Design a protein with these regions (language model features):
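Catalytic pocket of metal/acid-base enzymes, prominently hydrolases
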Residues: 1, 44-46, 194
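Anion (oxyanion) recognition and catalysis
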Residues: 1, 17, 76
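Short acidic/histidine-rich active-site segments
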Residues: 4-8, 24-30, 46-66
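Short acidic active-site motifs
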Residues: 11-12
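Distinct, well-ordered alpha-helical segments
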Residues: 35-42
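Active-site microenvironment of metallo-dependent hydrolases
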Residues: 60-79, 83-194
Length: 194
């Protein structure tokens, strides 16, 4: 792989960036590792392979704290320069995902952007979508189109009717033992373990 958002420690991030991998520092509702990852790579001179991401944020978290703008604020709090933090969440992340028309203000790029009055607080004063002003000072200006996505559409997944026994797990038993994969929780960091 050439990208990883599973680094939990400064050492892991440093090793991966030294190997030329893209490293994502994530701040989700349950995993917060921006500070740890940043502390491992902050002495690099070249940050094009460093990205900021959320991975998963709950709706309540987004409502009260924001989304990627909140992750950028966290990176700045931990010592990252504001412009480098913004670039890590926009252009670097777009490049990582192979989205060549996102992440910058340039001809041929999608004109989705926001304006802020303070590079450290990152509270949007104006929001543009497809080149049009859609929100200003916290007020929605654009009309919202009602869209319908019927579940019975032609491209839907068709599943037979399920019963309780369909959810019973029948693991392979070897010498009276079963191998189980677990998710372990380490102080705001999830880790997969065997």
């Amino acid at each position: 792989p050439n990208t990883c958002h599973e680094s939990r420690t400064a050492e892991e991030a440093l090793e991966k960036m030294r190997s030329g991998m893209r490293v994502d520092a994530r701040d989700s509702s349950i995993t917060k590792n921006v500070e740890a990852i940043w502390s491992g790579v902050k002495d690099f001179r070249f940050f094009d392979n460093f990205c900021l991401c959320t991975d998963d944020r709950e709706a309540d978290d987004i409502l009260h704290n924001g989304h990627i703008n909140d992750v950028v604020r966290a990176a700045i709090r931990y010592g990252m320069e504001p412009v480098a933090a913004i670039k890590s969440a926009t252009l670097n992340s777009a490049r990582e995902a192979g989205l060549q028309n996102l992440g910058a203000v340039a001809p041929g790029y999608a004109a989705d952007m926001l304006l802020v009055d303070d590079l450290r607080e990152l509270r949007p004063s104006h929001v543009f979508y497809a080149g049009k002003l859609v929100a200003q000072e916290g007020r929605l200006l654009a009309e919202i189109e009602d869209k319908s996505y019927p579940l019975e559409s032609a491209n839907s997944v068709h599943v037979r009717k399920l019963a309780a026994e369909d959810f019973t797990i029948h693991p392979p038993v070897s010498q009276g033992k079963v191998k189980v994969n677990l998710m372990k929780y380490y102080d705001m960091n999830l880790s997969t373990t065997d």
